[in-house]
Amino acid sequence: MKAERPDGRKLRALKRGHLAEYRAALCLIVKGYRIVAMRYRTKLGEIDIIARRGDLIACVEVKARASFDGAVFAVSDTAQRRIRAASDVWLSRQADFHCLSVRYDIVAVMPWRWPRHLPDAF
């Protein structure tokens, strides 16, 4: 059985998504966060970026859209549940999990603009 190769449209979307994640990570670094993980995957879900500033862990969903509102509303309830489930798995594997506080953020990446960070989005 052969592995499927993504067609051109899917490949462009994948590249655009990865570029958006790197732009979002740069935005967070400038704001004083340390990137702990990118594209953290579990059977329960995926977190685009896990960032840390002190004892705060930010589980960040990155959305590349034409507008800020479009990016924020693109994070469905199902996606939020999956991100929370994946963060529970990640936190359970941290030695200092008991002293960490967790927040769920969105970074909207729009064309020709600096990424916009929405802390405590859900």
From Swiss-Prot:
InterPro entries per record = Restrct_endonuc-II-like (IPR011335), tRNA_endonuc-like_dom_sf (IPR011856), UPF0102_YraN-like (IPR003509)
Q: Which domain of life is it from?
A: Bacteria
Q: Give the organism the record lists.
A: Sinorhizobium fredii (strain NBRC 101917 / NGR234)
Which PANTHER family does this one have? UPF0102 PROTEIN YRAN
Q: Name one Pfam family in it.
A: UPF0102
Which SUPFAM superfamilies does the UniProt record give? Restriction endonuclease-like (SSF52980)
Please identify the protein, giving its name as recorded: UPF0102 protein NGR_c36770
Gene3D superfamilies recorded for this chain?
A: 3.40.1350.10
* HAMAP family, per the entry: UPF0102 (MF_00048)
The family note in this entry says:
Belongs to the UPF0102 family.
List the Gene Ontology MF annotations in alphabetical order. Answer: nucleic acid binding
Transmembrane segments in this chain: where? Answer: none
Q: Which NCBIfam families match?
A: PRK12497.1-5
